[in-house]
Structures are given as C-alpha cells and as structure tokens.
C-alpha cells in the first residue's frame, strides 16, 4: 500500500543542515567528520530508545546492510560511502519494516517505490548522506508517522523540555514541550444569553489544556473543539420518534417561526486576571488536538449552553448555540470575560494565548465550526471541519420529507438536544434547569414539524450557508463520500460558496462513512495539519498554501490513490442523460413509452423480517426478489471502460400515486460481483502511533479490499410528491394524477469499473431513512418522461 506524502516541504541543503543541528541530530562540526563516523553518529541518533552511547553501539548489531553483513560490521570497515541498497536496508529497519517479512535485502528501493516511500540514488559523500538522512527523518514509517515522530515517541525530544520555545523541522512544529506538566484547568465564560430564563447571563464551562511553558511567558495558539458531547451524553435511543406511521398531508404546514432567547449582556473584562481555581477532570478527547498539544498548541474544549458545568438549555442548531460556542473564541482573543468559578467574582484572562485560534472536530463538532465561522468572530484564523452539517434541514429532512441520518431512524432535533443536555446530570442543576428544559423540548417538538417535513423559518435559522458571507478564516473541509449520517450535500453546498471566497480553502473527500482521516495510511493528513496550523496560527512561512491541491479525493477502487482536482462540482465532467426502457434497461438512447407501476407496502414486511436497516439496503440494491418487488429497476450494459460520476446527479420522474400524498426515492447503484473496499477503515496497527512521549496513541487504519459483494450504493435521494412545484411550499395533489418531479441526488465522485453496470432504482419507502407507512400505495411511473442526468469524467 502506498504511503503517499504531500506535507514534505522541499528544502535546500543549508536549511537542512540548520534544522538538523537545531535538533541535535547533526554535529555542529559535521564538516570535520569522516563519512564512516558521521554515518554511525546519524544512525545512532535515530535509535532514540537507546539512551547511552554504549546502548546505541550495541543496537548497531541489530541492523543489517545486506543479507551477509550487519551494520556494526560494515562500520568497522570505515567505509567512505554507502550503496543505495545498503543504506535503505538500514533505513527501512529504522522505519519499522522487517526484512524477509515486509521486504527483501536484494531490493529495498523496489519496495520503497511500490509503497511511495522516497529515496535518493547517490549517497557517496557527506553532503549527500546528510540530505539522505534529512529526507529519511521526514519519511513515513510503517506506522504511518514520519520517522521524526517515531523518534519523538521514544523520547528523543525530551532533551529540549523546559527551553520554553517552539522548534520547527521541515515547516512543522516538533514535540519539545513537557507533556507531563500540561496545565489542565477550567474557567467559566460569560455569554450574552439567558436560555434558562433566570435573569442572569449563561456561563459556559471551558476546559483548557496548555503547555506548562505558558506559565513562563510563552504565548501559544489554541485549537478549540466545540463539543456538545464533551460533558457526557444522555442515552435516549429508546425514546426515538415513531417512524412506522402514515404520511401526513403536508399542506397542513404552518411555517413554524424561530424566536431568539432573551439577551442579557455579559460584564466587560476589567483588565484583572487571576489563575484558574478548578482543575479539569475530563480528558482531551481528540487525537489531533493531543498531537498538536505535544507540539505547543493549547487544546480547548467547551460544550456550550446546556452541557455539564454550563448554564442554559440545549437548542440544537439555533443561533444561541452558535453564539455561546463563539463566546469561547472571544475570551481566547481577549474580548470577553471569564471567571475562575461560578460565583462570577474573580476574572481570569487567556493571557497565555497569542490570540490566534483554530478549530477542529468531526460531526457536531465540525458543524459548530461552520456555524461559528459564519459569525466572522475575531481571532478565528482557520477551521478544519470534518463531516459537518451546513444546514440542519439537510441533516434531518430532504425535499419535503422527514429523513433520518443513517442508523438514527426516529432521531430529531429535540432528541439530540436531550442527548447533549448533560447539565441535568448534576442534581442541583437539574432542579434549576428541568422546568425550562421541558419547555424548550416541547417547543422543539412542535416546531421541528415531523408531521409535514417542510422547510420553515425554524429551519432557516439553522441554515448556516445563508450566512456564509460572514466567513473570514481559512477553510478546510473533510467529508466521507459514503457518509449517510451527515450526507455529502452538506459539505458540497457549503463548498460551492467557500470556493468563491478569497481566503485559502481545501477540500478532502475520503471513502469512509462518518469518519476521521488523520490516521490513514494513504495520506499524511496529520503532517499537513501540523504544517497548516504552524502557518495559520504561528505565522511561520512554510509553504503550507502550496503543498496540496485544492481538492483531494480518495479513489473508490484503490484506497491508496488520491485524485487531485481543482474543484468538486458538475464542471469536472461532461453531461450524460440516460433514459429507461420498457424492458428495464437504461440507455442514453432509451425510449421507454410504458407506464410501469409498483406497490409500496411501507415497513410491514421489513418489521416482520426483523432484519437491520443495513441488511435491508444491501438486499434491496442487489435486487433480492422479496425486497426489490416494491420498486422499478433499470440497468445499463456492462461498462467497457471505467467511468467516473462527479457532482450531483439529477433525476426527473413523472409519477402518479394511488393516494393524494406520497414519497419517491431514487438510488444509483453499481452492479457487479467484485471485491470492493471495506465500508470502514481496517485497523492495521492499533495504538501504533505515539502522539507525543508517553502521551496517548492513535491507530493506523485504511480501507482495504474486502470480500466480494454484488452491488454498491453510489447515491440516492428522496422527495415529497406534494413539493412537486416548490421544495419550500407544499401543494395538494390528486390521487392517480401524474406530476413531474425534478430533484437532485446526493453529490458523489464514484468510478464504475469496466465490467460493472449502473442501475437506476425508483422506489418509495427507504427503511433506513424515510417514514415507513402502514398503508399500501401504488406508484405509476411514466417512462417517457423519466430520466437520470449526471456528469461523467
């Protein structure tokens, strides 16, 4: 598998020497060293676990330059150069590879080439040896980290603890901070909100992890993760809304309105500051933050209103949530007051912070990054938003229908608010908050409007895209192309806005579902984040803006292949339109004339079968007779050449329904029995990545070829028939009358290999996402007025 590397910054020899000397890897008087002695010195320096020269010398005998000579014996000969194969036999061992198991003595560079590991051809003098080692220290080891990080995990950089300053290598911050002395403290930031209606502004509990060196005058940036889950979650799956019910008449919609909570202005900072008096008991919960904390970046967590330690009630997705989370950045930047405890008597400032804040986090944590970025809050320099919601309507609804996130049937805004209302866990807080919490829950249940599923002012207040013009910070989005929790159109739609803005922006699309990608084999994402944060938050010019293409997309056939694109949109491809035929085929010159029908039975058979939603989906897309019966399927011939679908497919369907209401679902599926990638990354080295020195670990993982399957969902979408004219305004429809639907599927970037077919499936009830009616309904499709349009690359 290829260990692709994008974050390595090309560096001239003089800079290499300067950096190597700065980390005590290269002797300052290297010019007077002979080749053999210098080679021995550099190898021994890389053996960071051995702490004495005697121990390092003993270790040399454990390395071999060939199938007949150890490194120790080779060095005894006082060589004046080293062959490329000899050097990289040793290098691969330093990188954690095992001869005979991973590679052969006879061809180390061939192995490196196959795995995208860099090497140099000529190591015939001291200068070339030094450059070869500089590159080796920046080469990804078997565990996915660069060798320098592997050495850090063995204690190499403890020699620099207490020096009270950052150090950089190849444009990245290195772990020279004593992680045994991390300051772990809690403060209380005062907001301008009163969501619990007690007449006082809500306090937000903020947990800070910062280097001890900041108590000695060092100012550092902060990585802030706004996590409503940080204080704990209240399990409530058993109270999910019932989805086994008939569809309602959407014309009953009454456009529920959003109303902001009372505003109570916070005190202004008075210039005084005392140290925090409460110690953090929660642990940092995000590996990327931990990794950067060891490298000098403070890690800050806050759950915002309604979470444990904070005042207020949860109002999922509302402006109040955004404002309370943004207040933390205002405090970090010096613009808002915080107190040492809940008595509000002693102020404390973030005088350890340099005023530059970046944000991290996935899912809800990524969502709040988008929300906060749209406020343009001062101090926020960059966001790294993973698997984030850009409109809550697009999370819980679609085209006039109630649509569940994957594996969350029956969940909605009110239940997510309950999940995160962790301040109810404290008995005193429960007594105070519970009455106001109950009122808010009632309001959320009413206004989220599960009866009609329609867009409203309530949902408009939760659409961050409509405030995108407020974004001032640089932008990185990360999303899984197979994320059916936070569906891809959330990132696609915000990307279409961000890409037109002047600030620097990047997009990473991987093959996962609702997943992080910082520990993948196929891409050095963590190294890029290090480079990025150093540039954005420390102001170091390190070429971060030029290291990566604007858009990086992981291939769905080969996990270690990444496509470099200028954009992610329909413009990447050529428009193609396919039409269904009466015989169930799908052609560009299809000429179907028939009207074909299917009868949807809602969730009746699904409930009887007792299978999971994911099992149902696989059987359904494969064409299992029992589950495919309530649908129409149209298939292309086998593709002769690989074809990549990019952007957002669009479907037009002329349909009539036997009832004056209905829901239509459409899926695009790749058909063909073949080996596909695992649905989730496989753990390849559990706990194999050290985040610092004895400071937590992460697990190397990657998608790998899995057992053969018959089909793979590419994309899908759903629509309410009563929105045939307007996605934001329902109209009454008549039974047995044809209506034209025109709607977009989730965006994709998917390669159909030669030998596979493309299938268009038209159906109604999606057991994992839509409501599951209790009554039968027959749908008739007019094939002459039905088509699927997409863009081929």
Curated annotation (Swiss-Prot):
GO cellular component: cytoplasm
Alphabetical list of InterPro entries matching this protein: AB_hydrolase_fold, Galactose-bd-like_sf, Pept_S15_Xpro, PepX_N_dom, PepX_N_dom_sf, Xaa-Pro-like_dom, Xaa-Pro_dipept_C, Xaa-Pro_dipeptidyl-ppase/CocE
GO biological process, one term: proteolysis
Pfam families the UniProt entry points to: Peptidase_S15, PepX_C, PepX_N
A molecular function GO annotation: serine-type peptidase activity
Family: Belongs to the peptidase S15 family.
The protein, known as: Xaa-Pro dipeptidyl-peptidase
Organism: Lactobacillus helveticus (strain DPC 4571)
Taxonomic path: Bacteria, Bacillati, Bacillota, Bacilli, Lactobacillales
């Amino acid at each position: 598998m290829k260990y692709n590397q994008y974050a390595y910054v090309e560096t001239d020899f003089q800079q290499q020497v300067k950096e190597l000397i700065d980390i005590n890897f290269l002797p300052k008087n290297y010019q007077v060293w002979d080749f053999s002695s210098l080679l021995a010195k550099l190898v021994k320096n890389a053996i960071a676990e051995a702490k004495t020269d005697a121990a390092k010398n003993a270790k040399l005998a454990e390395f071999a330059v060939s199938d007949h000579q150890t490194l120790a014996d080779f060095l005894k000969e006082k060589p004046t150069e080293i062959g490329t194969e000899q050097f990289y036999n040793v290098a691969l061992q330093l990188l954690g590879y095992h001869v005979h198991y991973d590679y052969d003595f006879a061809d180390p560079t061939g192995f490196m080439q196959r795995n995208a590991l860099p090497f140099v051809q000529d190591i015939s003098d001291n200068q070339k040896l030094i450059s070869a080692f500089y590159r080796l220290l920046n080469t990804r080891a078997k565990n996915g980290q660069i060798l320098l990080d592997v050495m850090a995990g063995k204690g190499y950089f403890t020699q620099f603890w207490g020096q009270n300053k950052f150090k950089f290598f190849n444009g990245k911050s290195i772990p020279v901070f004593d992680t045994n002395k991390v300051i772990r403290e809690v403060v209380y930031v005062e907001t301008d909100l009163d969501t619990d209606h007690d007449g006082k502004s809500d306090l937000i509990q903020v947990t800070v992890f910062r280097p001890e060196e900041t108590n000695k005058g060092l100012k550092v940036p902060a990585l802030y993760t706004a996590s409503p889950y940080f204080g704990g979650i209240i399990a409530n799956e058993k109270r999910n809304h019932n989805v086994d019910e008939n569809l309602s008449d959407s014309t009953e919609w009454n456009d529920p309105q959003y109303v902001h909570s009372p505003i109570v202005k916070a005190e202004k900072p008075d210039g005084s500051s005392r140290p925090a008096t409460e110690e953090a008991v929660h642990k940092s919960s995000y590996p990327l933050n931990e990794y950067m904390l060891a490298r000098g970046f403070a890690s800050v967590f806050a759950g915002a209103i309604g979470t444990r330690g904070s005042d207020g009630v949860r109002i999922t997705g509302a402006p109040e949530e955004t404002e309370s989370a943004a207040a933390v950045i205002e405090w970090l930047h010096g613009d808002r007051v915080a107190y040492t405890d809940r008595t509000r008597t002693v102020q404390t400032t973030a005088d350890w912070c340099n005023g530059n804040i970046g944000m991290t986090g996935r899912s809800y944590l990524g969502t709040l990054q988008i929300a906060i970025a749209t406020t343009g809050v001062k101090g926020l320099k960059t966001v790294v938003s993973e698997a984030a919601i850009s409109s809550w309507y697009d999370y819980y609804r679609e085209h006039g229908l109630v649509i569940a996130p994957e594996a969350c049937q029956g969940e909605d805004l009110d239940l997510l608010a309950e999940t995160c209302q962790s301040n109810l866990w404290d008995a005193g807080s429960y007594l105070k908050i519970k009455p106001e919490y109950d009122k808010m829950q009632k309001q959320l249940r009413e206004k989220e409007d599960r009866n009609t599923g329609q867009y409203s002012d309530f949902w408009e207040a939760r659409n961050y895209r409509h405030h995108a013009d407020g974004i001032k910070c640089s932008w990185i989005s990360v999303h899984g192309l197979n994320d059916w929790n936070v569906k891809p159109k959330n990132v696609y739609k915000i990307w279409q806005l961000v890409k037109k803005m002047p600030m620097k922006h990047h997009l990473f699309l991987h093959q996962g579902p609702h997943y992080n990608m910082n520990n993948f084999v196929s891409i050095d994402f963590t190294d890029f984040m290090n480079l990025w944060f150093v540039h954005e938050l420390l102001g170091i010019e390190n070429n971060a803006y030029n290291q990566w293409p604007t858009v990086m997309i992981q291939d769905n056939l080969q996990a270690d292949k990444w496509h470099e694109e200028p954009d992610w949109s329909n413009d990447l491809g050529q428009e193609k339109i396919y039409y269904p035929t009466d015989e169930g085929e799908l052609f560009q010159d299809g000429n179907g004339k028939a009207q074909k029908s299917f009868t949807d039975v809602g969730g009746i058979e699904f409930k009887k079968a007792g299978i999971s939603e994911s099992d149902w989906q696989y059987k359904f897309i494969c064409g299992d007779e029992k589950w495919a019966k309530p649908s129409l399927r149209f298939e292309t011939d086998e593709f002769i050449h690989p074809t990549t679908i990019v952007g957002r497919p669009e479907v037009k369907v002329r349909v009539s329904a036997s009832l004056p209401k209905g829901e239509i679902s459409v899926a695009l599926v790749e058909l063909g029995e073949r080996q596909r990638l695992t649905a989730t990354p496989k753990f390849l080295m559990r706990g194999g990545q050290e985040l610092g020195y004895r400071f937590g670990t992460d697990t190397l993982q990657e998608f790998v070829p899995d057992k053969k399957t018959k089909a793979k969902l590419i994309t899908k979408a759903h629509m309410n028939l009563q929105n045939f004219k307007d996605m934001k305004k329902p109209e009454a429809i008549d039974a047995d009358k044809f209506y034209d639907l025109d709607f977009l599927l989730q965006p994709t970037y998917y390669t159909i290999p030669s030998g596979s077919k493309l299938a268009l499936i038209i159906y109604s009830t999606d057991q994992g996402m839509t409501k599951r009616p209790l009554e039968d309904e027959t749908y008739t499709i007019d094939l002459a007025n039905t088509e699927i349009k997409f863009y081929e690359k």
